[in-house]
Curated annotation (Swiss-Prot):
Disulfide bonds: none annotated. GO terms for cellular component: cytosolic small ribosomal subunit. The keyword Signal does not apply. Keywords: Ribonucleoprotein, Ribosomal protein, RNA-binding, rRNA-binding. One of its GO terms (biological process) is translation. It comes from Coxiella burnetii (strain Dugway 5J108-111). Pfam families: Ribosomal_S6. The lineage of its organism: Bacteria, Pseudomonadati, Pseudomonadota, Gammaproteobacteria, Legionellales. One of its GO terms (molecular function) is small ribosomal subunit rRNA binding. Gene3D superfamilies: 3.30.70.60. Belongs to the bacterial ribosomal protein bS6 family. This is Small ribosomal subunit protein bS6. Residues 104-126 are annotated as: Disordered.
Length: 126
């Protein structure tokens, strides 16, 4: 079994369907004895350039371990799903389980905003 990194861009109008899509893709992987090592939902983000007159997309990142048959099935599922506007599948040497830089930045942003809010409350009380 090989390790893969998959990035999927979903049409922003279909963002509500993302959890069902993720569940479907995970079940496709697990049916064939594959493993999902990392799954990150980056949310809706601005695209660098418009794709089919769409300027934003819902981003998903998956790191999986599976065989080539599952990857072929996933490619077909992405190709024939109108909600998926782009997908990228990369072969990796090993499983990547730690948070991506985008998620680490989001977590730091949340913690720093909490610190700012706590400092503001402390200064108001003083």
């Amino acid at each position: 079994m090989r390790h893969y990194e998959i990035v999927i861009l979903v049409h922003p109008d279909q963002s509500s369907q993302v959890p069902a899509m993720v569940e479907r893709y995970q079940s496709m992987i697990k049916e064939k004895d594959g493993k999902v090592h990392r799954l990150e939902d980056w949310g809706r983000r601005q695209l660098a350039y418009s794709i089919d007159k769409v300027h934003k997309a819902h981003y998903l990142l998956m790191n999986i371990e599976s065989d080539q048959g599952v990857i072929s099935e996933l490619e077909n599922a992405f190709r024939y799903n109108d909600a998926v506007i782009r997908s990228l599948i990369l072969k990796r040497d090993h499983a990547i389980t730690k948070s991506s830089l985008i998620m680490q930045g989001a977590e730091k942003g949340k913690s720093s905003s909490k610190k700012v809010a706590a400092e503001a409350e402390a200064s108001e009380e003083a």
